[in-house]
Amino acid sequence: MVSSQAKYELIQEVGRGSYGVVYEAVVRQTGARVAVEKIRCHSPENVELALREFWALSSIQSQHPNVIHLEECVLQRDALAQRMSHGSSSSLYLELVETSLKGEITFDPCCAYYMWFVMDFCDGGDMNAYLLSRKPSRKTNTSFMLQLGSALAFLHRNQIIHRDLKPDNILISQGRTPAGSPEPTLKVADFGLSKVCSGSGLNPEEPASVNKCFLSTACGTDFYMAPEVWEGHYTAKADIFALGVIIWAMVERITFVDVETQKELLGSYVQQGEDIVPLGEALLENPKMELNIPARKKSMNASMKQLIREMLSANPQERPDAFELELRLVRIACRELDWDT
């Protein structure tokens, strides 16, 4: 990492995907552990993903315990590197923005461009692996749904639509668990598909205004995508649907096997013969379809069942917004001790 060799020491690679590599690192001065993600900006797709992540995380003016925190971002071209800032006018930054807007490389392809993200280090893997490696626990389910509800309300309050909520993109931090808490801390991460809506002419002082920001790019992971995302006309209510898929799957331990990776994943779906169909796709075809909730348990708390049904409504107007959702999750967890039965 060119500009920060004296500041960070890369320890080991902890993850690798199609867009980049993640390392465990330490801050030399303090010994604190951080995660360093290196994204190679060699294609318009990679550039757009990296910029979206930077724009979303750098737009947040305060920290939230359940949202990954961006310490800094460094942009590197060959041996030249500089710390990025929101709204930068540097030539390196503007070249990447132009590439993202035009959908084609606008800089010298012989140059090696990288974006380095320094973020919280999460030592517990992702939510999917964590839950599936343990027996179901009401305490864990309660803790996780409250943390996720709080995180989503925070993001929407900051005009950020995540657009790819799924257990693989929710990290586990066991080392930073609050004192007295028996459960680990969740961190919503991977903002490569996110959208910041504050620049769309909306009133940033109006908490629910993010739900009036209409988007048209169909993106995300199919088993967590809302019906309207498949159509290409949606708002932040698509995040509510995705969280509904996650919570329902978590409570009942509903899983499926990804065809490409053969990995077992948490996620609710519709069974059609021998095939499993994403909920959003099935509801798009049949908006009046009744979801079989609970699917595996003999019974489910009436308040929880009703909330999941509303979160997974085919009509986004019938879903609670993130602020109502957060309050209802707290109410269910605190007032109804049998919610997970």
Curated annotation (Swiss-Prot):
InterPro entries: CC_SR_Kinase, Kinase-like_dom_sf, Prot_kinase_dom, Ser/Thr_kinase_AS. It catalyses: L-seryl-[protein] + ATP = O-phospho-L-seryl-[protein] + ADP + H(+); L-threonyl-[protein] + ATP = O-phospho-L-threonyl-[protein] + ADP + H(+). ATP binds at residues 14-22. It holds the Pfam family Pkinase. PROSITE patterns: PROTEIN_KINASE_DOM, PROTEIN_KINASE_ST. Its EC number is 2.7.11.1. Its main location: nucleus. Residues 8-332 form the Protein kinase domain. GO terms for cellular component: cytoplasm; nucleus. SMART domains: S_TKc. One of its GO terms (molecular function) is protein serine kinase activity. It is found in: Nucleus. Keywords: ATP-binding, Kinase, Nucleotide-binding, Nucleus, Serine/threonine-protein kinase, Transferase. Belongs to the protein kinase superfamily. Ser/Thr protein kinase family. This is Serine/threonine-protein kinase pdik1l. It comes from Danio rerio (Zebrafish).
